[in-house]
Amino acid sequence: MITLFDSAKKQKIPFTPIQDNQIRLYVCGPTVYDDAHLGHARSSIVFDLWRRLFLFLGFEVVFVKNFTDIDDKIIKKSLQNNASVQEIGSHYIHSYLKDMASLGVLRADIEPKATDNLPQMCEMIQTLLHKGYAYEGENSDIYLRIHKDKNYGALSQRLEQSHTQSRIQNAQDKLEHNDFALWKGYKGENDIAYDSPFGKGRPGWHIECSAMIEKHLAYQNEEYGIDIHAGGSDLLFPHHENEASQTRCATGREIAKYWLHNGFVNINGEKMSKSLGNSFFIKDALKVYDGEILRNYLLGVHYRLALNFNEEDLLQSKKRLDKLYRLKKRVIESHIQSPQITREEIKQFTHNIKETAKEAHKTFLSSLVEALSDDYNISKALSIIEDMLSTSNEYLDKNPKDKAYKQAIKANLACIEFLLGLGGKSTQSYFQLGLDEKTKQEIESKIAKRQEAKAQKNYALADKLRDELKSQGIEIMDTPQGSTWEKI
């Protein structure tokens, strides 16, 4: 059984999909006016982990993540850079996808852009106008009148807008100050505009997600549009509250059966955000740390809790990943990188565990999945993995040639890779991380000279070269197939 903390009900509850064996999951993607930061990374990793778990358990998952490419900040950026809004959006979408790939985040099944879904937005706004939930102001803006939605505030338990007045545009044009914009009329040469049935303008932020869910994901004849709507906890109010309201008013049903929200990444006690100027951009972090090391760190705190970024904690968490790769090195040749793992292969792996492994391995996978199915209890899951790594190493120390046991370990590692997105590199490449190509070539050259010295029985030179490399933090391992090396 899967349990999750539903943000609407404010408690952990059992998860039951709307339709058997299917899950429709929507995650709010980035507003593409700047590079992605570690807050974006964490949110993407969190819901990538949920998606992997659902897939592992056999669900057919349709995963949608949007790009907001119409926004005040994008317009401002385009003016600053003398570039079109389309150029700004395309550039940062490409940058975002590149960063996510480096972090091992699976691509969404559908990645709609706001600019590609304007007809659906206009259609929903027309429906809201026709039903009397929306009205047009004096400046051609169209607002949702929230007091007509008797369930407004049910998701966030909030009614009052707490943002600054800068977020409340044209307050004098509203019937009530908490009414929010569905459509923003064209304001002049520094604005952008699209044709619509209500004149030139552009959509408000909230209507974008509702319209894209209706087009790409929603069930049309169910009590709820989709199974799960997810995003950062900063989106709960007003964004998700407003999404829920306008969809409810337009369609007569709730937008989602369950709501999931992840916690912030904090730097010096403040939420990481572009507007605060404390963003640790992913592209900058990747210059220092490999994406898998960042992923391993960011998934290590329960998804609903705030993560206080600390490089000491990051380096400490890397030791956990080192231990995983060292066990992998004992059972898989160092140059072999994991292939893309399918569910059928996972089924075969688990079958092998039941058929050939010791009792400890039989219970590993079920214990791991049970922990993850409990509102993604990552602390318990990592403890289970740590126990498996330690137990496996202890057993192999005494029984280094037990092939059946090694096969079971391979299966365990493959399941960890599928579920957590960790351990997919070859051990050789993992233990050589952080070195540029020039340095690697210099190391390989010294190793070749050492091999030549050994062939000529010049053991003094061979030992000297080994010592030189060791002083540089490089350890050489001699095997029947030749010499390999890793960064200590």
UniProtKB/Swiss-Prot annotation:
Localisation per UniProt entry: Cytoplasm
GO molecular function, one term: cysteine-tRNA ligase activity
A single BP term in Gene Ontology: cysteinyl-tRNA aminoacylation
InterPro entries named in the record: Cys-tRNA-ligase (IPR015803), Cys-tRNA/MSH_ligase (IPR024909), Rossmann-like_a/b/a_fold (IPR014729), tRNA-synt_1_cat_dom (IPR032678), tRNAsynth_Ia_anticodon-bd (IPR009080)
UniProt cross-references to SUPFAM superfamilies, sorted A to Z: Anticodon-binding domain of a subclass of class I aminoacyl-tRNA synthetases (SSF47323), Nucleotidylyl transferase (SSF52374)
Reactions it catalyzes: tRNA(Cys) + L-cysteine + ATP = L-cysteinyl-tRNA(Cys) + AMP + diphosphate
Name of this protein: Cysteine--tRNA ligase
UniProt organism field: Helicobacter hepaticus (strain ATCC 51449 / 3B1)
Encoding gene (name): cysS
